[in-house]
């Protein structure tokens, strides 16, 4: 499940240099008063095991659902965004984030985790989820993040899991998988 909407909004437009602070503030942000939709609540309440990223927006999403994680692990945290100096531009953080993520996906990572390393982490995360699913009597819920959730989903499919339900990829949305 993708976490709820973070409370942090920050400035409407920032320079590329200011994006480092914006990203740090975003990573420290919880979900504030964001309320999960009923569909997310019912999915989450059906879970017999709950795993989570350690980032505040994931943990506060579980709190909004009145749930506690069984496991909190760095392996589930979002892939960091690199920041590239591009003087003279003031853009919305969303535009910068898309640009920086595309650069990252192209293998240009500067001083953050490389895409290949994140993919290896996704393999590890999928292995953890698969192990919990095999041991569990019910559903396993991961409260995670957009990019890492997609990378983990790819690895779950490679392990023989099949997606049988997808709400989308936005806040509070989830995809469900079964081992075939």
Locate the predicted segments by residue.
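Active-site-proximal alpha-helix that buttresses catalytic centers in soluble enzyme cores
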Residues: 1-76, 94-124, 172, 180
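Signature for phosphate-centric chemistry
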Residues: 75-90
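Beta-strand elements within well-structured catalytic alpha/beta cores of enzymes
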Residues: 1-2, 51, 138-148
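Feature marks short, surface-exposed loop/turn motifs that line or immediately flank catalytic pockets
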Residues: 8, 79-80, 148
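Active-site catalytic microenvironments for nucleophilic, acid-base chemistry
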Residues: 64, 68, 132, 155-159
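Domain-level recognition of soluble alpha/beta enzyme cores
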Residues: 17, 157-180
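Glycine-rich phosphate-binding loop signature in dinucleotide/nucleotide-binding domains
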Residues: 44-45, 129-138
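Short, well-ordered alpha-helical microsegments
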Residues: 58-60, 149-152
């Amino acid at each position: 499940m993708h976490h709820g909407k973070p409370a942090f909004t920050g400035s409407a437009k920032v320079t590329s240099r200011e994006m480092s602070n914006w990203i740090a503030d975003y990573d420290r942000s919880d979900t504030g008063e964001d309320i999960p939709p009923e569909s997310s609540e019912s999915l989450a309440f059906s879970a017999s095991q709950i795993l989570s990223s350690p980032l505040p927006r994931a943990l506060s999403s579980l709190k909004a659902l009145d749930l506690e994680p069984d496991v909190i692990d760095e392996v589930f945290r979002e892939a960091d965004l690199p920041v590239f100096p591009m003087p003279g531009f003031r853009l919305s953080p969303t535009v910068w984030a898309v640009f920086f993520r595309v650069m990252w996906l192209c293998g240009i990572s500067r001083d953050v985790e490389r895409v290949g390393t994140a993919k290896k982490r996704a393999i590890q995360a999928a292995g953890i989820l698969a192990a919990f699913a095999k041991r569990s009597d019910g559903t396993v819920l991961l409260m995670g993040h957009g990019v890492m959730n997609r990378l983990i989903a790819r690895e779950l499919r490679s392990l023989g899991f099949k997606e049988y339900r997808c709400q989308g990829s936005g806040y509070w949305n989830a995809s469900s998988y079964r081992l075939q």
